[in-house]
Amino acid sequence: MLKKEQLTVESINDGISKTFSQAFRFLAHHELRKNRTFMLDLGVSILKKFLIDSRDYKVEVVQDFCSRSLTDEFKFKFTSQPIDSKSESDSASYIRNYLGPEGIKQFGGSNWWLYRKSPLKSWWIERRHHIRHNLKCDKVIFYVHGGAHYLSTVRTNAYHIQRHTAALGARTFAPDLRLAPQFPFPCSLHDVLSSYLYLLKSTKPENIIFMGDSSGAGLIVASLVLIRDSKLPLPAGVVYDSPWVDLTHSLPSVVADDAADYIPSEGFHHRASRYWPITNLDSFSTISEKELLNYSKKQELTNFIENSIRKKIQTIKNLIPVLQEMDKEHARIDFDNVDSRLDPNILTTFPFQVQFYTSNANLKHPLISPIFTENLGGLPPSLVLGGSGERLRDEIVYIAHKMNTDVYNGKRTKVRLEMYDDCCHVVTALPFVKEAGIMVRRAANFAYWCLKQHDSSFVSPNKHLDGNPSHANEDMVRLRISRNGEERLMEPKDEIQCLNLPKSALGTIQVKALIRWIDVELILLSKDTKKPARYFAEFKHADLNGYLVKPKEYTMEGENPPLSALVANCKISPEKKQ
């Protein structure tokens, strides 16, 4: 069995090996690679190898490894701040009102997502230099970390959060999020909104800048729409760093062969475990209790479930030739008009859950994939950052333009879009990368400008900022930034592929992306079907026989939590666990 200690050692060894091999490749082919920086290439290579190697480990092992603290305690002070129950309760009410009765039913109820294994807290982050010299600042960065909705913590993301804190010269307030699959949507959204409501009790909204990276930036879009529609006060400005806003992966760059990114083209995968016992938990909810009760013995139930898993694997194997034929035609799967070669109900019958964060049927919900939000107008001034080498570049460009096109109560969203040449996903997280430093400084200068619109007397402690970004008075600024920080105007909209796709393509499944995802998942499943069957059989046997101990929030009337939450957070009564 693979242990988490092995993951640490093997990752370090692989990283060292990769460092030397990449160094020699750079020296040997410098002229061929002169448009890329060595440290950027190196960082991408190490992260990509880690994400691919981590597939052979259980999701909870990788989560534990990715929760290591990377704080600089010498330069920064981290102070935990519990969030009060009133903020949590008010946040839950706003989410329920936004979802409405149908939405609440769609996501399994109005209470299960209030359950926590530990109290909600956020982190205050301050430079020790400011504390020593009593340099008080009432401006706050509200930072939401990324990690594909299932990895990382505030302290793991500390490297780039600290950089943003220092660059603006403000304090940072960053919530620790509950992670999928143990805590799927809307758990992390509730954490973000609760923390913001708490912050508003001590900080004026015009003194707050929202920042986030990747899935955290996507959460910010969803949160701001909810805040806007709930008539709550909006912050002074927003910085989105490589926002992940389309969990259907419907835009072309996701499958592009020219991506210079560490995000694998096959998506995220991990071996089965007690927290993720079978790849698509929801597909087993279709097995009736009557059918399961035919298997009174745990081993009989295990055998039945293992056979079911094997049948589902075979179903997918039979589907591959059809998908390969469709891929030759550059086809897409449109769930409103499914190709006649496929099951018309493929969205619900496809026996794999593609994202840890939510079921396949919910991927297009606007609070999960904000690119499908009907109206993104009327939001605070927004800086949208991305790299021309990342897989998510199309959705980054698309949502920036949508924000500025949509009109909400007569207002568009003022948008500044900056795409950095050759950069990968969330390049600010990579150390010693020149482009990352440029991006952090430009983000701080934009945030400074936003804050000065409400408080002209504010002076950032960072003397390198002037609070006057280029084209500041324009409603929509579209720039490409070179590796040296030089600006040039982005090409016309009609020359950008993702802005000229038919609207019907948005939210459809690219067959090439699906094939790549299936190929990796089948490899993992083929390694072992007995363990996932045993894990799930233990859970179902306990549930059917009345000795599964559930959190009280899961047992309230009308609650039907996602199975990934159930298997992770319910306990089998110890005296019955034989």
UniProtKB/Swiss-Prot annotation:
Keyword Mitochondrion: yes
TM spans (from-to): none
Listed InterPro entries: AB_hydrolase_3, AB_hydrolase_fold, GDXG_lipolytic_enzyme
Record-level Gene Ontology MF annotations: hydrolase activity
Entry's Gene Ontology cellular component terms: mitochondrion
Localization: Mitochondrion
Pfam families assigned to the protein according to its UniProt record, in alphabetical order: Abhydrolase_3
Protein name as annotated: AB hydrolase superfamily protein C4A8.06c
Family: Belongs to the AB hydrolase superfamily.
Keywords: Hydrolase, Mitochondrion
EC number: 3.-.-.-
